[in-house]
């Protein structure tokens, strides 16, 4: 029993010492112009075709999914207003869209899994998902004790992702717009899977702001837009370039 009590006392003493050391480190960092934040929030958006191709005749379905992100930030303030914000973020991106298209170039899995390229006219549905680790860096401007604006760049690495879908209620021209026609009524569909073609790297810009609601708690909003499409330039199956564009919001804890 004595050994258990002694062990508990040692553990409590160690915890208190570690807490005190952490508090001292944070105070020392604050004295040198450093701030720290832990963020968590949701993102809503999708992969937008830029420019909008004439083959897309209308969007009939859109599901932004539940995209979660968490981020740690360190801010270095050089004067009362200007600073530099660096971070490390884990994020999810995704969406489901359905559209009516005409002569849309793609590849479909026909027959016993054979992939055939051609042009599709009818309904097409796409399901995109990606998980990435991101390094953002931004310039920050402190408006007052409550508000902060920031804008900058980010680079990300996708470690998991998929891009799948199906077509139905239309017809497929094999090889070219005048190739052999294969009809797909509303009760029949063909699938596609381009997951293995997704780019690993992403770079883009972000702009947003935060507001201190309480002493340690803030709310924030941010627009993130990628400069790079989700497929590399060598991927010729889809002639349209798709760029991730997301609006993000959430809460953060300010140390």
Which positions does each model-derived feature cover?
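Outer-membrane beta-barrel strand-turn architecture
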Residues: 76-80, 141-145, 213-215, 255
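Outer-membrane beta-barrel "beta-signal"
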Residues: 211-217, 243-255
């Amino acid at each position: 029993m004595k050994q258990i009590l002694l062990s508990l006392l040692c553990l409590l003493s160690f915890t208190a010492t570690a807490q005190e050391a952490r508090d001292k480190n944070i105070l020392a960092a604050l004295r040198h112009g450093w701030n720290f934040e832990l963020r968590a929030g949701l993102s809503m958006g999708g992969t937008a075709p830029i420019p909008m191709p004439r083959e897309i005749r209308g969007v009939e379905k859109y599901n932004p999914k539940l995209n979660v992100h968490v981020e740690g930030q360190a801010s270095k303030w050089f004067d009362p207003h200007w600073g530099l914000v660096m971070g490390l973020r884990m994020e999810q991106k995704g969406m489901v869209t359905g559209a009516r298209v005409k002569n849309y170039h793609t590849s479909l899995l026909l027959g016993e899994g054979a992939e055939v390229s051609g042009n599709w006219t009818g309904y097409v549905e796409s399901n995109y998902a990606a998980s990435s680790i991101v390094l953002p860096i931004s310039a920050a401007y402190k408006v007052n004790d409550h508000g902060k604006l920031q804008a900058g760049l980010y680079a990300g690495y996708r470690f998991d992702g998929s891009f799948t879908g199906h077509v139905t209620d239309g017809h497929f021209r094999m090889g070219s717009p005048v190739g052999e026609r294969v009809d797909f009524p509303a009760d029949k569909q063909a699938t596609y899977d381009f997951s293995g073609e997704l780019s690993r790297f992403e770079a883009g810009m972000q702009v947003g702001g935060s507001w201190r609601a309480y002493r340690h708690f803030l709310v924030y909003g941010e627009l993130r837009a990628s400069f790079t499409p989700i497929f590399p330039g060598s991927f010729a199956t889809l002639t349209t370039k798709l760029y991730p564009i997301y609006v993000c919001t959430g809460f953060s804890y300010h140390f």
